[in-house]
């Protein structure tokens, strides 16, 4: 018997067989017959399609069609597909409001729900489709928990908005608020930006969190080559989804599981691509969480080790000129990976969802067609990666800074301390913040907020007011992938558990040195001891529901803000 014939005969119902066969499972099958199952369908593996379709965000408004394309691909491959939904929240719409506290917890809800449905229904494999920021890590954590054959599909990037011949993105609207407050544009001009920034379906267009994570997942080998950069409205995106349905069936046939793909070296490939592209600080948090789930030993030190050897080569927003759709036009993530592989920065022997290795996937990949305007390895934006891990007496477990596009990587100035983003934003808009200040937003961590919200409103207004390189912004919360300027987040331990930020007082001198990888404040040990004795943890800001449960379970940001 040939190997091919043997594979065809292999029973791929690795879990669903407990429902598909046996007299005692007659009632179970009756429910599936209501869905249209016939006798022959029970002889096939059952493959789930986890859809994050929703009308609460443009990132996900089109995903139902992609889920149906994946369903078609699964059927054509010879399996029985079942679509189910999970949630999404819109980071952009909730930004700057209390709703932003639910963004990071939604990552866990997505993972929990995917794990729950696939486990309860005894599905054999999975295609997961995500659009907005937390969809990607949520789907990947769910995939890692299940360790069943799986392919991730990214819903795709939005196209750039157009106004007066210039490209816009969602961050243009956030920064426009600062420009309006500073008197640089009037209300009519701001309204035009609002109306033009987001032209249709897809996730935020720059190298923000969604595009960063889609790139990381493709580099890790868990998405089909090229799919990370295809725009949401392109015909390629539907093709990606259909192909994913066929690919997951092949993984099931070959017995290839996420643990076979998501190795330490695969995570190193993901980090390498994130550093080269100048990706979001959120990638650090999410990759730590995914690695924990798949039982790969990944720490902040691994990010710093890779950062030192990988140049930042992409001129992408938020600090650069171009968006993901432009990168797609010149070859996308495969072309970037081929360049990095040729330079010896990528592990080529890692397995991927194609069933081939990274190197095998890249063999037929054309080189970048860019004239070095978007990607330039020989003249990088920075000789090392832009996501810097800082440590010191203000963040003993670490903090994350993004230095892309900055001419200033050092600041020493007085702390301007706020216990909420809204208070800090009000002070910025009222011109109470001056060049040289270090704005501190604390009690914004995983437990303290709870939910570790992003500070895009505050950071964007600073940039819009021309203070992006003269005022630092420090928090135990997060920053959007759209944030730029001198921003430092993820400070750990967080304030809520008595981290050093909780002991800061107005006008304490803070030193941030991205070159020396240091973050500290000039307060004597004796004074710190006195403050520590007086400090009391404030009551948690949620005592029931989603946020209360999250606050009780969540770990430090330095561990990925995991909940298990």
UniProtKB/Swiss-Prot annotation:
It is an enzyme of class 4 (lyase). Mg(2+) binds at residues 91, 133-134, 454. Binds 1 [2Fe-2S] cluster per subunit. This cluster acts as a Lewis acid cofactor. The active site is at residue 480. GO terms for biological process: isoleucine biosynthetic process; L-valine biosynthetic process. PROSITE patterns: ILVD_EDD_1, ILVD_EDD_2. Signal peptide: none annotated. Its cofactor is [2Fe-2S] cluster; Mg(2+). InterPro entries: DHAD_IlvD/Edd, Dihydro-acid_dehy_C, DihydroxyA_deHydtase, DiOHA_6PGluconate_deHydtase_CS, ILV_EDD_C, ILV_EDD_N, IlvD/EDD_N. The modification N6-carboxylysine is found at residue 134. The keyword NADP does not apply. It catalyses: (2R)-2,3-dihydroxy-3-methylbutanoate = 3-methyl-2-oxobutanoate + H2O; (2R,3R)-2,3-dihydroxy-3-methylpentanoate = (S)-3-methyl-2-oxopentanoate + H2O. Functions in the biosynthesis of branched-chain amino acids. Catalyzes the dehydration of (2R,3R)-2,3-dihydroxy-3-methylpentanoate (2,3-dihydroxy-3-methylvalerate) into 2-oxo-3-methylpentanoate (2-oxo-3-methylvalerate) and of (2R)-2,3-dihydroxy-3-methylbutanoate (2,3-dihydroxyisovalerate) into 2-oxo-3-methylbutanoate (2-oxoisovalerate), the penultimate precursor to L-isoleucine and L-valine, respectively. Homodimer. HAMAP family: IlvD. Belongs to the IlvD/Edd family. This is Dihydroxy-acid dehydratase 2. It comes from Staphylococcus saprophyticus subsp. saprophyticus (strain ATCC 15305 / DSM 20229 / NCIMB 8711 / NCTC 7292 / S-41).
């Amino acid at each position: 018997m040939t190997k091919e014939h043997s594979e065809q005969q292999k029973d791929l119902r690795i879990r669903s067989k407990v429902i598909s066969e046996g007299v005692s499972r007659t009632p179970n099958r009756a429910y599936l017959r209501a869905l249209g199952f016939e006798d022959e369908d029970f002889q096939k593996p059952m493959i789930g399609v986890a859809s994050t379709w929703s009308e609460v965000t443009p990132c996900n408004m089109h995903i139902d069609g992609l889920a149906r394309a994946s369903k078609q691909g699964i059927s054509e491959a010879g399996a029985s597909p079942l679509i189910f939904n999970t949630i999404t929240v819109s980071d952009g719409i909730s930004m700057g409001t209390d709703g932003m506290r639910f963004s990071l917890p939604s990552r866990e809800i997505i993972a929990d729900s995917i794990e729950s449905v696939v486990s309860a229904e005894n599905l054999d494999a999975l295609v997961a489709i995500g659009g907005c920021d937390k969809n990607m890590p949520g789907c990947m954590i769910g995939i890692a928990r299940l360790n069943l054959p799986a392919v991730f599909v990214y819903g795709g990037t939005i196209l750039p908005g157009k106004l007066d011949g210039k490209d816009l993105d969602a961050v243009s609207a956030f920064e426009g608020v600062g420009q309006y407050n500073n008197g640089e544009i009037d209300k009519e001009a701001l309204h035009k930006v609002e109306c033009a920034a987001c032209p249709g379906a897809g996730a935020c267009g720059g190298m923000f969190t969604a595009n960063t994570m889609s790139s990381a997942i493709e580099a890790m080998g868990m998405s089909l080559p090229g799919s990370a950069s295809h725009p949401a409205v392109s015909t390629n995106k539907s093709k990606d989804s259909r192909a994913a349905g066929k690919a997951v069936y092949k993984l099931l046939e070959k017995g290839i599981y996420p643990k076979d793909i998501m190795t330490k070296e695969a995570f190193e490939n993901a980090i390498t691509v994130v550093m080269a592209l100048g990706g979001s600080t959120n990638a650090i948090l999410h990759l730590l969480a995914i690695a924990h789930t798949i039982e790969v030993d990944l720490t902040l030190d691994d990010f710093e080790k890779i950062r030192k050897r990988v140049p930042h080569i992409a001129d992408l927003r938020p600090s650069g000129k171009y968006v993901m759709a432009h990168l797609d036009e010149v070859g996308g993530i495969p072309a970037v990976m081929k360049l990095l592989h040729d330079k010896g920065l990528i592990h080529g022997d890692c397995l991927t969802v194609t069933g081939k290795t990274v190197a095998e996937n890249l063999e037929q990949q054309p080189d970048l067609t860019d004239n070095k305007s978007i990607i330039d390895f020989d003249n990088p934006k920075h000789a090392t990666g832009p996501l810097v891990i800082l440590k010191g007496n203000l963040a003993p477990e670490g903090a994350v800074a993004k230095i892309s596009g900055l001419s200033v990587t050092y600041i020493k100035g007085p702390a301007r301390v706020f216990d909420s983003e809204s208070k800090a934003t009000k002070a910025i808009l009222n011109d109470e913040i001056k060049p040289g200040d270090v704005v501190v937003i604390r009690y914004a961590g995983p437990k303290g907020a709870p939910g570790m919200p992003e500070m895009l409103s505050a950071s964007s207004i600073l940039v819009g007011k021309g203070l992006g390189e003269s005022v630092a912004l420090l928090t135990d919360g997060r920053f959007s992938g759209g944030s730029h300027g001198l921003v430092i987040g993820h400070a750990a331990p967080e304030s809520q558990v008595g981290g050093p930020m909780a002991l800061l007082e107005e006008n304490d001198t803070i030193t941030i040195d991205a070159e020396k990888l240091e973050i500290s404040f000039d307060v004597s040990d004796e004074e710190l001891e006195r403050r520590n004795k007086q400090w009391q943890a404030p009551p948690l800001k949620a005592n029931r529901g989603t946020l209360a449960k999250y606050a009780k379970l969540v770990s430090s940001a330095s561990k990925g803000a995991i909940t298990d």
